[in-house]
């Protein structure tokens, strides 16, 4: 018979277990403190290495950006120098061609359009002279274009010596980069401002019919009934704003945190009615002001026409005065021609063909000017005579239709004198 094996039971006391756990915790704490100190040293070294690498990368990036700026400016200067040389050669050829064409036309003018002798006088300007004036204008325009092409280089400023410093001057390089970034931002802001101006112009073109009508009719308004766009906008805002104590048909979320008013869908018909009423009021006031202005203008025109008729009755002796002025003008011209002859005789001495040609040019110019003055005087005198012949009354004319002198002494002794600014002849 097999005897049963006995198993020994392991009896563990709680005190022994507590001691074992304490010893294990002590070993763990010592190990953790040692591992934490070594890990902290490693992290500090990694942080310093990483910071050095970042500083080095930033320094390299700044140097690279400076090199790119220098290369960009060098390329721009080279391109502008090429454009300048090309424009210079092109404009020189254009100037040479204009000089050649001008000389050819001037040669044809001097050969074909010789001035006529002193009698008869020609007041019209030769064709070649007009061509010369047009060529002169074209040549001046090309010269201005050519001179403006040299001003392109002034826009680009090359890098100064202070901007190409060694790598150690990090603060100075940072200032340079900030300046360049600020300049680029200013250029972008300028472009945005240009876009805003274009958008504002488009918005002005898309104005409503009411604003357009008011803008067209404010010129005819009386100063007491003057209306401008700001007044209309203020009136619209005042009428659209609800009363604080009254019940409103608007939603709860009409006013947001910034107290900005947003009308709901229920309020749109009311707003439309108020705007239409305001439009009608404004248009009625405009029409009333225009009617008053028309009445005033009619009265002024009536008064002016009455004074005009009174003044025209005074001007019966005007043709004789014009004839006297015409004769005195002819005498002055003859005297001037005589003085020219005398001066030329004293200065030039004996006449030759060249001197006669110079005289011919000078007398052509003098005759052209004098004939134009005489022609203008004759036209004004004829116009006055025609108006007087129309407006003169029948009892003050002869059987042949010639005007008689009108007794106008009683008009000159009136108490109410006539304003000279209202004379319309």
UniProtKB/Swiss-Prot annotation:
Region (Disordered): 393-413
Disulphide linkage map: none
Gene Ontology CC terms, in alphabetical order: membrane
Coiled coil: 41-91, 172-208, 292-340
Keyword presence, Coiled coil: yes
Subcellular localization(s) per the UniProt record: Membrane
Protein topology in the membrane: Single-pass membrane protein
Induction entry: Induced by srfA, during development. Down-regulated in grlA null-cells at 16 hours of starvation. Rapidly up-regulated by hyperosmotic stress, which is dependent on dstC. Shows early transcriptional response to sorbitol exposure.
Keyword Isomerase (UniProt): no
Transmembrane segments: 91-113
Swiss-Prot/TrEMBL keywords: Coiled coil, Glycoprotein, Membrane, Transmembrane, Transmembrane helix
Residues annotated as glycosylated: 25, 28, 36
This protein's name: SrfA-induced gene G protein
Origin species: Dictyostelium discoideum
The encoding gene: sigG
């Amino acid at each position: 018979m097999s005897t049963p094996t006995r198993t020994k039971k392991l009896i563990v006391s709680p005190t022994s277990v507590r001691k074992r756990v304490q010893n294990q915790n002590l070993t763990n704490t010592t190990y953790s403190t040692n591992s934490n100190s070594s890990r902290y040293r490693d992290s500090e070294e990694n942080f310093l290495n990483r910071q050095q690498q970042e500083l080095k990368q930033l320094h390299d990036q700044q140097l690279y950006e400076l090199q790119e700026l220098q290369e960009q400016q060098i390329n721009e200067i080279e391109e502008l120098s090429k454009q300048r040389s090309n424009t210079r050669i092109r404009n020189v050829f254009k100037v040479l061609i204009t000089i050649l064409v001008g000389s050819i036309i001037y040669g044809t003018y001097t050969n074909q359009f010789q001035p006529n002798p002193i009698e008869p006088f020609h007041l019209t300007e030769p064709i070649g002279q007009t061509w010369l004036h047009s060529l002169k204008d074209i040549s001046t325009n090309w010269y201005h274009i050519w001179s403006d092409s040299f001003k392109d280089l002034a826009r680009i400023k090359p890098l100064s010596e202070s901007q190409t410093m060694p790598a150690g001057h990090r603060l100075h390089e940072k200032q340079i980069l900030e300046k360049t970034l600020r300049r680029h931002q200013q250029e972008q802001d300028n472009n945005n401002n240009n876009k805003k101006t274009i958008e504002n112009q488009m918005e002005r073109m898309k104005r409503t019919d009411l604003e357009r009508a008011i803008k067209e009719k404010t010129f005819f308004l009386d100063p007491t009934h003057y209306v401008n766009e700001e007044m209309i906008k203020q009136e619209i805002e005042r009428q659209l704003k609800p009363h604080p104590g009254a019940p409103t048909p608007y939603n709860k979320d009409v006013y947001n945190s910034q107290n900005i008013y947003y009308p709901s869908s229920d309020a749109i018909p009311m707003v439309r009615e108020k705007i239409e009423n305001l439009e009608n009021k404004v248009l009625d006031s405009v029409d009333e002001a225009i009617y008053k202005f028309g009445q005033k203008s009619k009265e002024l025109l009536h008064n002016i026409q009455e004074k005009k008729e009174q003044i025209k009755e005074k001007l019966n002796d005007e043709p004789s005065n014009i004839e006297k002025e015409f004769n005195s003008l002819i005498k002055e011209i003859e005297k001037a021609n005589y003085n020219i002859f005398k001066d030329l005789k004293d200065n030039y001495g004996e006449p030759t063909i060249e001197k006669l040609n110079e005289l011919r040019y000078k007398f052509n110019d003098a005759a052209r000017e004098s004939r134009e003055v005489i022609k203008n005087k004759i036209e004004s005198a004829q116009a006055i005579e025609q108006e007087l012949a129309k407006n003169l009354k029948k009892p003050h004319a002869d059987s042949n239709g010639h005007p008689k002198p009108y007794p106008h002494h009683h008009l000159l002794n009136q108490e109410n004198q006539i304003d000279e600014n209202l004379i319309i002849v």
